[in-house]
């Protein structure tokens, strides 16, 4: 049995927004409200980052077209006593999925930790790290 830090990524669609900053604020608020409703206040909510295909520099994953925004969100939580990496992934998706129904969740990263220190297994589905 192991303890893991699991980072999930989720695309959040928001409506009636004017700018990327507005979309980010609404998306974070929407996700935090859904998590708090299910008493999941231990899940950390952060803005996702994308990489510019031209220059390679990272930027916040928020796009607005016609007052509709798409925001990439990272959700981080600790999973205790999981039997394996895959088990930790399933637990994290089940816990967060309970609050964010109909939102596709994908594992961004999983790290095993012992005694509060991260070590060992790491899975990063992105080819470019920031």
From Swiss-Prot:
It comes from the Archaea. Pfam families: DUF555. Coiled coil: none annotated. InterPro entries: UPF0212. Belongs to the UPF0212 family. PANTHER family: UPF0212 PROTEIN MJ0068 (PTHR42199), UPF0212 PROTEIN TK1194 (PTHR42199:SF1). This is UPF0212 protein TSIB_1358. It comes from Thermococcus sibiricus (strain DSM 12597 / MM 739).
